Amino acid sequence: MVFRFLGNNNNNNNELPDQQLINEIGYLSNFSNEQLEQLLDIIFEFMIIQKSEQLLNQIQEFSNEHSINENTLKNIIRGCIIFFKSSAKNNLTIDHLREDCIQFKLDEEQSKLVSTKYKQHYIEISRSLVGNSLTINQVLDMQWRFGVTTSSSEFTKSNTTGSTFLQLKLVLDKGNNIKEDVHMELTLPQFYEFLKEMQSAKASLEYFN
């Protein structure tokens, strides 16, 4: 059993998620597709804009609408956030994410729904995660390379085949001699927008310092 979101490959020394996370993600299999889609929208919205008060209100509304215990729902969302963050950190492909969902006991249709939603929000999630990392960690190194999309590219649509994209790798200092690699895949307009946001954040930090 190989869980790709943990950075595992096909060797024999694969890490396994803890039982709590297995239970939290696996609980998604109890939802209808409509409920699952609604919950995923809530989770991805929070991961992108990170408004805790709004999330708590949405949890209460979802709990009341579908008769699900709020604490149970919070645990499910916590597990999903861990799963999606780790998937983005390890630059997981859509197929590998779908395979992980199946190993969490979601059926094929549910797994496809989760991976499709993840694909739709991948760029925004990655940008949000990198932005948060840059606010609390020193960047030790930055590497990038350009590529041209093909019809099989994970995060492109068929009408963007042949366009240029940029793969970005940041090496962050986590403290205590610990380093972390953060990966992103962006189109050029998205990269320039990301760069503009980082320059604005840098200017704000310099102002307050």
UniProtKB/Swiss-Prot annotation:
InterPro entries registered for this protein in UniProt: COMM, COMMD4/6/7/8, COMMD7
GO BP annotation list: tumor necrosis factor-mediated signaling pathway
Residue stretches making up the COMM domain: 138-209
Gene Ontology molecular-function annotations: NF-kappaB binding
Family: Belongs to the COMM domain-containing protein 7 family.
Described function: Scaffold protein in the commander complex that is essential for endosomal recycling of transmembrane cargos; the commander complex is composed of the CCC subcomplex and the retriever subcomplex.
Assembly description: Component of the commander complex consisting of the CCC subcomplex and the retriever subcomplex. Component of the CCC subcomplex.
Name of the protein in its database record: COMM domain-containing protein 7
Species the sequence originates in: Dictyostelium discoideum
Lineage of source species: Eukaryota, Amoebozoa, Evosea, Eumycetozoa, Dictyostelia
Gene name for this UniProt entry: commd7
